[in-house]
């Protein structure tokens, strides 16, 4: 089973790299940042959905977006620190539905930025000098895609790829190591 997941991760990496290469980032540091942070977003999104469903099997995307604010707060309490906490408007599927908005890349960046802010106390890493390193760069697309005419295209391609790939419950329950697979594959490339 892990071989299937390994191939799924590698295919997603290849598809994302193709997007970034087409945007002029082949082999650059910006490609690495976009790739790892896109992948992190995918992981956190699917892990959150997995944890929500572990609380109650009825907690699928369609039900989560309809939940009252109070019920959603209770769900977040139940999930605790098992994963980063996301709001329904931050789910990949929600962003996927917004991809035709003007300046979608800004919607994408704002979403990742808010996830980083909301989870900063628990999920940021600190340097020796006690500087917090956030989950996501504040201007991930803007700072890495110099050609402003390509920013929406890149953000849309990312969200389409992330929405297409589904990491199911089995991948989380078996403890598949996403990031070792990701980084080993990137090093070989």
Cite the ranges covered by each PLM segment.
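Non-catalytic, mostly N-terminal accessory regions of nucleic-acid modification and defense proteins
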Residues: 1-189
């Amino acid at each position: 089973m892990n071989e299937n997941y390994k191939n799924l991760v590698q295919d997603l990496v290849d598809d994302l790299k193709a997007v970034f290469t087409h945007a002029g980032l082949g082999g650059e540091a910006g490609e690495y940042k976009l790739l790892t942070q896109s992948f992190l977003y995918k992981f956190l999104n699917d892990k959150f959905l997995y944890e929500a469903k572990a609380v109650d099997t009825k907690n699928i995307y369609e039900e989560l977006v309809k939940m009252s604010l109070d019920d959603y707060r209770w769900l977040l309490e139940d999930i605790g620190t098992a994963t980063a906490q996301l709001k329904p408007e931050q789910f990949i599927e929600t962003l996927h539905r917004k991809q035709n908005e003007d300046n979608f890349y800004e919607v994408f960046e704002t979403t990742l930025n808010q996830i980083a802010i909301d989870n900063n106390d628990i999920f940021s890493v600190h340097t020796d000098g006690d500087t917090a390193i956030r989950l996501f760069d504040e201007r991930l697309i803007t700072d890495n895609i110099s050609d402003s005419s390509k920013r929406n295209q890149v953000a849309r391609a990312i969200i389409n790829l992330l929405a297409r790939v589904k990491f199911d419950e089995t991948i989380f329950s078996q403890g598949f190591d996403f990031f070792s697979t990701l980084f080993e594959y990137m090093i070989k490339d």
